[in-house]
Each structure stands twice: as C-alpha cells, then as structure tokens.
A protein has these predicted regions:
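Short loop/edge segments at beta-strand edges and connector loops
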Residues: 73, 125-127
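N-terminal lobe of the biotin/lipoate ligase/transferase fold
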Residues: 1-103
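A generic structural signal for well-ordered coil/turn residues at beta-strand boundaries
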Residues: 3, 43, 84, 127, ...
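Long, positively charged amphipathic alpha-helical accessory segments at protein N-termini or as interdomain linkers
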Residues: 23, 99, 106-123, 137-233
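Structural motif
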Residues: 133-134
C-alpha cells in the first residue's frame, strides 16, 4: 500500500482548482507532502485549456461572456475541454511507479471504470486516456510528468452538459461519438458524495493507495493563494 492522503475540496473557483493541482504536484515531487488523491467541482462553467492549446482556435470567445464561462489553463497537456458545475474532477499525484506512460493511463483510468461499475454503470477504458460508457465518453484524463512523479487528473461527467457545443469550436468536439453522463446512464441523479466515495474506494482497491483524510498544508494554502490568478486566461 502507498501512504497517501485524500482531500475533497468541494466546489471551488476554476483557477483555484488548477492551482491546487499544480501546487500539490510540486509538494509531492519535492517530498514535502505524501501521494495525494484530491477531488473537486468547479463553482462555475469552465473552459480548461491544455498546457499548449490556443484559446483563439479552440474557444468561441464571442459566446463566453454571455454564458458566464471562465477560461483557465491547466498544468497538463491534452485538448481543450468544457467542465460544468456538476462534473467531478479527480487528481492523483504520486511517484511514477508504472512501467510506461500507457500503463499508467490504463491503470488509473481503470480506477474510474471500477468506480462507475460500483454505481451500476458498465464502462471501459479507451486508450489513451478516456473512459467510455454506452460507447460515449464519460471521463477523460490528462497527465503531467516530471522528476519521476506524475499527476493524472480528469473529469467524471455526472450530469448532461448542453453548453459544450455552444462554447467549444466544432472541430474540437471529436474523437468520440459524444459524451454521456452518470445521470443518462442510470436515469437518475446520484448524490455527489456517493460518486466521490466510489472514486476513493476504487483508488484504494485498484491502485493500492492507503488513503487517509487530509487537507492542504499551510505551505500549499499559501502557494495556491499566490498563484491562483496565474491560471486564468
């Protein structure tokens, strides 16, 4: 088992969540914090740009302001995504113990597959970094790797997100035949705490994390406060 902590941040501003992802990676990779699984939701609809994405290509800026959508840049690579307030974002930061990048994606995404299975949803891993249910994307992930450590974070779609086609440029809504939510798979709403518990239990059983309830350290809090604004676009 891997000594680690679990943090549920609840609903937070988009830039705060992105800063926490980055700061936790810094602290874990420097040995000041244990391996960490943390989850959060965003307090407003958000466009999350991959590390190298161009917002002028991916985003319909003319509709952002009227829709009340924030834009942030995350520490990981990958495509531009839309996240609504109902989605749950997971982020795991740990030593890179995996034989390959492909294996790390598969094993961590399998945790999400297991979590969804415990809720009654038949899902499967789609390489390199997606989880599908009913042939549609229900979770997508991205990674950041450095200094022998990795951060993998991703979304779990809990409720339908009708704004996605209005906000993202059509060319970027591809690669899978649409998205699906937990609600659409089950025909009912699943409380957030139930989904979070399922995610936590799957990381214990599938990845061997010995999770203890925790919180951000004082150093992490201070760093997040200082750096949050830098993640806005």
């Amino acid at each position: 088992m891997i000594e680690s902590r679990f943090i549920d941040l609840g609903s937070v501003p988009p830039e705060y969540g992105s800063a926490v992802d980055a700061i936790i990676f810094d602290e874990v990779s420097e040995g000041r914090s244990p391996a960490t699984l943390h989850v959060y939701s965003r307090d407003r609809s958000t466009i999350s740009l991959g590390r190298f994405r161009d917002p002028d290509i991916d985003v319909k800026r003319d509709v952002l302001e009227s829709a009340g959508v924030s834009v942030i840049r995350r520490v990981s690579g990958g495509s531009t995504i839309f996240t609504g307030t109902s989605q749950i974002i997971y982020s795991v930061t740990m030593e890179d113990i995996f034989p390959s990048k492909k294996d790390s994606y598969q094993r961590i995404c399998d945790c999400i597959v297991t979590a969804l299975g415990s809720l009654g949803i038949e899902a499967g891993y789609k390489p390199p970094n997606d989880v599908l249910a009913d042939g549609k994307k229900i979770s997508g992930s991205a990674q950041y790797r450095a200094k022998g450590f990795l951060l993998q974070h991703g979304t779990v779609i809990v409720e339908p997100e009708p704004l996605i086609d209005e906000i993202l440029s059509p060319v970027k809504n591809r690669g899978y035949p649409g998205t699906v939510s937990i609600y659409e798979c089950l025909g009912r709403t699943v409380p957030r705490n139930i989904v979070v518990d399922a995610i936590m239990e799957s990381f214990i059983s599938k990845l061997g994390l010995d999770l203890e309830d925790g919180m951000l350290s004082d150093r992490e809090h201070d760093s997040v406060r200082l750096r949050s604004e830098s993640f806005k676009v």
